[in-house]
Structure formats: C-alpha cells, structure tokens
Amino acid sequence: IDDNAALYFTSGTTGIPKAVLLTHKNLSHACYVEQSHHGQTIEDIFLCIPPLYHTGAKMHWMGSFLAGGKGVLLKGIKPEWIMEAISEEACTIVWLLVPWIHDILIAIENKDIDLSKYQLSQWRLMHAGAQPVPPSLIDFWKKYFPHQSYDTNYGLTESTGPGCIHLGLENAHSLGPIGLPGYEWEAKIVDKNGNLLFANESGELIVRGAGVMKEYYKNPEESAKVL
C-alpha cells in the first residue's frame, strides 16, 4: 500500500511545477475521504469535467469509484454542454469551478439556457473549489437550484487532491470559509516559527493525514521543506 502509484504535477503558482509522488495508500485514502464527505452510492452518477491529470477531478471521481457509481467524462465547459450532460446522463453529483458556475448562471439569466428543457431533479449535489468561492455566487446559484446540497472543497496536489479541508454539507449555511479538516485529516494554522495561531490571526495552513504525498519526486531539498 506504500508502493509508488502515480505522479501528479503541482500548478506552479509558487514557482516551477513540481512532480508529486503519490502512493497506493494516498489514492485509496482519497476514495474514502470523498465518499465520506458526499455519501456516494452505486446509484450516483458523477459528471467529471476537468482533465484527469488534475487531482481535483480525479479524486472527486474516486468517491463514486469506491461506491461502484458511474462517472461521465465531459470534453468541454460550455454551459449548454454541461446541462445537456447532466440531463441526458442523469448525473447526481457535479463539481464545478467558479468560472463555470458563473457562466451557467449568466446563460440562465440571459435565457440562453431554459432549465425547463432539462431533467435535473436527480441532481442532488454541486460542489466547488480550487479557488476562492464567493458566497454571493452560491447564493445566486441557490436561487435557481434551491434543493441542491452544496460543499466547498480545499486541497492541493500534495494532499492527493481535494478534501483535506472542506465546508461540509451540514455547513452550507456558512459560506465563505473553506471549512474544517476532512475525513481522517488534521489541520492547524501556524506562524513562521511553527507556533499555533488562533481566530483572526494570519499564518500558514498545515495538514496531516494519510493523503499527504510521499515526496516531491527526486527533489529531496523541496521535500524536506514541507514534510
């Protein structure tokens, strides 16, 4: 279970992208994290839009994979394509990036999308992440989709994708924060000396759990800085 399984690359927001070495334990833990957070069953159908080299796409799908649920891959992000896929494939769970949420809402407002033409009653959960999610955007979303559950996900390639921190379905009334430590994760915020910080103090978020990467591949110097 500790054998090497996959290489994913960081986005490079803080420098040159680094290769992240993940183990079979990392990947299997991601399955359990996602399934624990969103309760996928064999009846769920997940719409996967981002490319699979992105851990945020692959690991969200893993929750359905663990439950034996179906996954649908969509090669495009036009609002009409997304809604058609959800309707035609009877998708129940969809993970969206903020720009896609915005584009769908604008298309609805401009009447480029007529929701009455789609079968959407089975769509039980929309969740978002990978960047700050404006609370006003989700409030706007709920105007059109009031019966859906919602979750915000936070993660990084080094934590095998999303879910080390998440808002939680039960906390959807508290939009804005990224949330609390996810299933079998621990987290705290510290200062530059590693001292624990408290409410309304700014610092660095550190996490611990079975999803933490093995290392930056063939990069012991950078690995030592973060592990």
Where are these regions (language model features)?
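Conserved S/T- and glycine-rich ATP-binding loop of Class I adenylate-forming
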Residues: 4, 10-13, 46, 52, ...
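Conserved AMP-binding/adenylation subdomain of ANL enzymes
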Residues: 28-45, 53-93, 107-108
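Short beta-strand->loop structural element characteristic of the AMP-binding/adenylate-forming
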Residues: 18-21, 48, 70-76, 151
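Short hydrophobic/charged patches on amphipathic alpha-helices used for structural packing
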Residues: 80-83, 115, 224
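Conserved ATP/PPi-binding loop(s) of AMP-dependent carboxylate-activating enzymes
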Residues: 180-184, 195-226
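Conserved pre-ATP/AMP-binding loop-to-beta segment of ANL
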Residues: 1-9, 16, 39-45, 198
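Conserved AMP-binding A3 loop
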Residues: 5-29
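Gly/Ser/Thr-rich phosphate-binding loop
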Residues: 66, 91-96, 105-173, 183-186
